[in-house]
Amino acid sequence: MACTTILVGKDASYDGSTIIARNEDSANGEFCPKRFIVVKPDEQPRHYKSVLSHVEVDLPDEPLQYTAVPNADLKEGIWGEAGVNEANVAMSATETLTTNERVLGADPFVELTPAKGKKGEDGYEPEVPGGIGEEDFLTLVLPYVKTAREGVARLGALLEQYGTYEMNGVAFSDVDEIWWLETVGGHHWIAKRVPDEAYVTMPNQLGIDEFDLDDALGNQEEHMCSVDLGEFIERNHLDLAVENVTPFNPRDAFGSHSDSDHVYNTPRAWYMQRFLNPYDEQWDGQDADHQPTADDIPWARQPDRKITIEDVKYVLSSHYQGTPYDPYGKLGDQRTRHMFRPIGINRQSQLSVMQIRPYRPQVNRAVQWIAYGSNPFNTLVPFFPNVDSTPKYLEDTTTRVTSENFYWENRIIAALCDASFADTANAVERYQEKTGAMGHRMVSTTDGQIDRLVEDVIDEFDADDETGDVQPMEPDEIIEAVRNGEAREVLAAANETMAAQLKAETDKLLDSVLYTTSMNMKNGFHMSDF
């Protein structure tokens, strides 16, 4: 999928949380209705078969419960995309990445080979399944891992065993760490821990630009990789460093810097970092330190100020506001306004922002913020993933267009607003601000309810310990603490209240923008009938 990702380390976020976020964008010319669901252990398959690649994988017993945002239409598979499990581990999968011919020549993709002929006849060749891909990743990994690091290890092992038919980037987070994994060819992979004080921007391009192979093949403190990566690089002459003392650069070795990258990928990283580090360097003009087409925009950077949930939503909704490249703007001309691929694009399916908060008890530590549809015109609102069911307004997405579920209502609103951007912009902004404030208020109020419910637990721990974690626990203890039926009922009730308020406000926005755009129709006539 064509997506955009931002990862925010705990010391770079406004409240000490780890934050991972990704737009899921459908392919050009397609829309992909999404659902927000809880997958219970008895609903998780024990034997999995991919729809696209036909690969079959036996899965462990005793999976953890987890949230997901799968397709409403399962004809191409589940595509779970984003979720949080009972160990308070979050996963976002995947960001489609680019590569190069040298990598694919050395380690080809593992693609489905259809059967030839008919079984029993001369010349028959049976089908050869492909590897695993975005369709499968969340389902195969998230229910079975108890830390972000375990997520990297499990996905890496699956990639080495089954291979993949596409290049992908995947984020994992827990309360302490964020890890970013990038696939390399058919069977190889690298992963790097996001620095606590930094954020990471990822368009659809292999991004890691500095990698410690000794650490990855040794202690794995900040880096991990497939077991034979060093030999793979050396055997296929993939390290392009001029000097031996230069840190290994995976972006040069495994990635791309094509003409299409310069209109589709690098401008997105440029705009996100331009917004989050406005004073760090010169961003505009001929003397800019980095142009939108630069191939060396850093993978990770320390922000000029702490990053909020609203900052994450803004950059993942952006269409180059304040630059000549804004398709809705008045700067530049028709050529520049359609020069680069916006981040907030028409074919956005969903945005999930997963926040793991160290200052909350384990039972309500995780928050999954959700938006559906095209980001410039939608809103991002919070839901607690530690529940046994999700609100119907977000879960019961149909393949039929209707204003009765959140996905399609947002899709309709976006189409109306695009046609009358300037005239509807104020209504959309008021809606986003109001629903965002409602979301923060819901989280705060629910936190208070949980505090009263687990007061004895909170008093037991020192909130000022060296990690800032008010309830530090081993993974198995986290799972036990999270499986609190009474707390789950409180969180589910809060989610239902949020969804009801969200629907009321979204209905009002639809009413408003439908009226405005209808009044702007080209067949209107301002003289009253007489």
Where on the chain are the PLM-derived regions?
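C-terminal/peripheral segments of proteins
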Residues: D15, S26-G29, F36-P45, D58, ...
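Short, well-ordered beta-strand elements within core beta-sheets of diverse protein domains
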Residues: L138-Y144
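Histidine-centered catalytic/metal-binding microenvironments
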Residues: G436-F530
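Substrate-recognition/cap regions that form aromatic- and gly/pro-loop-enriched pockets
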Residues: Y325-D462
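A contiguous strand-loop segment
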Residues: A2-E134, R154-D289, A294
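Glycine-rich, aromatic-lined ligand/substrate-binding cores of catalytic
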Residues: G230-N364
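Short, charged, surface-exposed loops that flank catalytic or proteolytic processing sites
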Residues: Y144-E150
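Short, well-structured alpha-helical segments that form the helix of a local strand-helix-strand
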Residues: G151-E160, V312-L316
